[in-house]
Regions:
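N-terminal entry/capping and adjacent linker segments that precede and initiate structured domains
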Residues: 1-425
Length: 425
């Protein structure tokens, strides 16, 4: 009888498999790629507690930003304002907060949040004028879980407020801007990796405050980069900069201000956007590729070269990207009208889509009607094209600036620190 296969000459001992390399043998780059595949922030926080190397890699700003960009942003809700931001009258806008999360941790944070900044101290004001609330805090911007607030006739008393932890940083740009009634236009940009922030402002001059240095740095607004061929605009740079009468918004590493040019049947107006790249500190003014009056936002999309635009045309969403020579190209154009939106459009006269923000593959919009105060907030996943809907039912319309509010993520703690990491969102 033939011997069974594998038994010739007696039994043989199987070789032992090579031992797995120790954790310490993994290079930082390879370990970073592994950490990027973890499912959520809670898992990343747990990994950061494993050892010093894992904490160093997990808390590296480059890894942290990539991890955050690959996952759904921790949306808590939408902070709405009425027209209180208009040049006249100078008053604090009325606020309204719409809860917009189904995550229990985020919902709990929203329930305890001071989104109307009622815990900030009220001070006596020397500016007494009937009908004006100079001593009230006024919302000027929002990014990374922080609110930028101002008060006083000149709007130069500033606060950066975290409504979840109810902590604030107070600052005043003494000697930077003129003391003139609400002339300065502001914006705030928060670094998600470490929680540091920049406050940007400009009137006849520009300045940036960094929380890392604790100082204001003046910027020469005459060095604003203009689009090639816009000769007329170059001669009118002084006047045109001051046509940006509203506060700015944040979009990743960019801060931007919209001219909000209105449609006019008597001439062909254009919409211009002033942009500050906070990595290079370069200012520029660009012309929007769509007609004036359309709703839009700026987006920071590295996969499309950085600065991009999302605009709405009726109930369609358009993505604009830059080509090799700096011109605008329509990358995507698709209808938002699913069966639900068609039904709402007929039943509630909802026809307008306001684009609020775009972040990490998600676009945040408001579906509203000029006839009614209520609306619906839409969160579109650009990868799956699935859309979440959150109803908004206020008594009065809030058509001023609106801000998606995202949970501010705490820095990752190391294995030798005795505090827990609160990133379970």
């Amino acid at each position: 009888m033939e011997p069974c296969e594998g038994t010739v000459g007696g039994a043989t001992k199987k070789p032992k498999p090579s031992p797995a390399p120790p954790i310490a043998a993994l290079g930082d780059d390879f370990l970073g790629e592994i950490l990027l595949r973890l499912p959520d922030m809670a898992s990343l926080a747990s990994a950061a507690l494993a050892c010093k190397q894992w904490h160093r890699v997990a808390s590296d700003p480059a890894v942290f930003r990539r991890f955050d960009a690959l996952r759904r942003p921790p949306l808590v809700g939408f902070l709405l304002t009425d027209r209180g931001d208009m040049p006249s009258p100078y008053r604090s806008p009325n606020l309204f907060f719409v809860h917009a999360t189904r995550n229990p941790n985020l919902a709990a944070a929203a329930a305890d949040g001071d989104f109307f900044f009622e815990d900030l101290p009220a001070v006596d004001s020397d500016d007494e004028e009937e009908g004006y609330d100079w001593d009230e805090w006024r919302l000027r911007g929002c990014d990374g879980g922080r609110l930028l607030l101002s008060r006083g006739r000149d709007g130069l008393d500033l606060a950066v407020y975290d409504p979840i932890s109810r902590t604030a940083v107070f600052l005043r740009p003494d000697g930077v801007f003129r003391a003139c009634t609400h002339v300065v236009r502001y914006a705030i940009v928060v670094d998600e990796a470490d929680g540091s922030f920049l406050v940007i402002g400009f009137d006849f001059r520009g300045a940036v405050f960094s929380s890392r240095s604790g100082k204001w740095v003046k910027i020469n607004m005459e060095r604003v980069k203009l689009e090639k061929g816009d000769v007329t605009y170059e001669h009118e740079i002084f006047d045109k900069i001051h046509s940006f009468s509203s506060d700015g918004m944040a979009a990743g590493r960019f801060a931007y201000w919209r001219s909000n040019t209105k449609k006019d049947r008597h001439f062909n107006p254009v919409e211009r956007i002033m942009v500050l790249d906070t990595t290079t500190m370069e200012w520029s003014v660009i012309t929007a590729p769509f007609p004036a009056g359309e709703s839009y936002c700026v987006a920071d999309m590295p996969e499309h070269g950085g600065l991009c635009l999302f605009s709405s045309k009726e109930q369609c969403l358009q993505l604009w990207v830059r080509n090799s020579v700096g011109g605008w190209v329509l990358k995507k154009d698709f209808s938002l009208l699913n069966e639900w939106m068609k039904k709402i459009r007929r039943a509630e006269w909802m026809k307008r889509v306001r684009v609020l923000a775009a972040r990490a593959g998600y676009v945040y919009m408001e579906f509203w009607s000029i006839r009614k105060a209520n609306s619906y907030f839409l969160v579109l996943n650009m990868r799956t094209m699935k859309m979440s809907v959150f109803p908004n039912n206020p008594e009065d319309p809030h058509r001023g600036p609106a801000f998606p509010f995202f949970m501010r993520l705490e820095p990752l703690l190391g294995p030798d620190e005795d505090q827990n990491v609160h990133l379970d969102v």
